[in-house]
Amino acid sequence: MISFSSFYRQIADTQLQHWLESLPAILGEWQRQHKHGNLPKWEKVLAKLHYPAPEFLDLKDSVTIGDGLQLDSGQTEKLENLLKILQPWRKGPFHVHGIHIDTEWRSDWKWDRVSPHLSPLTNRTVLDVGCGSGYHMWRMLGAGAKRVVGIDPSALFLCQFEAIKRLIDTELPVHLLPLGIEELPPLDAFDTVFSMGVLYHRRSPIDHLLQLRDQLRMGGELVLETLVVDGDKDTVLVPQDRYGKMNNVWFLPSIDALKLWLEKCDFTDVRCVNVDVTSLAEQRSTPWMQNESLVDYLDPKDVNLTVEGYPAPKRATFIAVKNRSPQDAD
């Protein structure tokens, strides 16, 4: 069973220590109630990941573990077969002892778009909401973050993250909790909070922005990336049924509308720093993710539209600063 004891130990004397009053019970309940049928199989994979500490590690420019020379061919083949049990791999890529985990998303491209606009992460305590398997968390650590906490309710993402962590160093200050943000007690403690690819999945986007705000310290930085549409401050697309075959897409605002939402939630210095149409090269099926992908979600006759006739995915990244505490604002 995956243990969170290292996380509890590491936050005991930090600004996150108040979580110790409630998170052990919340995560204990998750462990008791989570009944995903594949979890025992995935945990068996984790139990077999006994490999020497990597002699080479790059988290600054990629997520590369080992130089490809440390393991013999038999060890490498065994490791690759174990990691393939954890498919589908959606966020990455990862380079593990010469094995290229070619994930569905080129998450490194997103990081390259976002990272130049961030306040330096050096010595910052960071929260990554909807972190997936944790690719960006490793890049945050590589950028100098003091501590990185990611949250995502998926058991598979948790196991993928744990696999990578066990191949690097289990005591590094980077942790994934299998929770949604609505389960986190407000903390007002993080220096930087990321929410990338989450807002459009929320039934109440304003509540999500307030939940993000409640995790930030005063003056802390929010990094928000989400799907947007063209239009003015009054433009919001609400898909009638599905969007790109997804039935959990609720609100796609215009850039100006989202800026207004952020300001309404007491964020200041709101800036849209990047707008990018998702390309077929950035999101696609691979041997490590063999399900449908972006090409299957777009109109085969016009890639500027989804199969439902909505505008194709366009993503905007915003940076904003928490201006007031919840007590002052609400």
Swiss-Prot record:
Q: Name one GO biological process term.
A: tRNA wobble uridine modification
User: One Pfam family name from the record?
Assistant: Methyltransf_9
- Write the Enzyme Commission number(s) for this entry: 2.5.1.-
* Reactions performed catalytically: carboxy-S-adenosyl-L-methionine + 5-hydroxyuridine(34) in tRNA = 5-carboxymethoxyuridine(34) in tRNA + S-adenosyl-L-homocysteine + H(+)
**One MF annotation (Gene Ontology) recorded for this entry:** transferase activity, transferring alkyl or aryl (other than methyl) groups
CDD domains the record matches:
AdoMet_MTases (cd02440)
What UniProt keywords apply to this chain's record, in alphabetical order? Transferase, tRNA processing
Q: Which residues bind carboxy-S-adenosyl-L-methionine?
A: K91, W105, K110, G130, D152, P153, S154, I181, E182, M196, Y200, R315
Q: Write out the similarity annotation.
A: Belongs to the class I-like SAM-binding methyltransferase superfamily. CmoB family.
* Function per UniProt: Catalyzes carboxymethyl transfer from carboxy-S-adenosyl-L-methionine (Cx-SAM) to 5-hydroxyuridine (ho5U) to form 5-carboxymethoxyuridine (cmo5U) at position 34 in tRNAs.
Q: How does it assemble?
A: Homotetramer.
Q: What is this protein called?
A: tRNA U34 carboxymethyltransferase
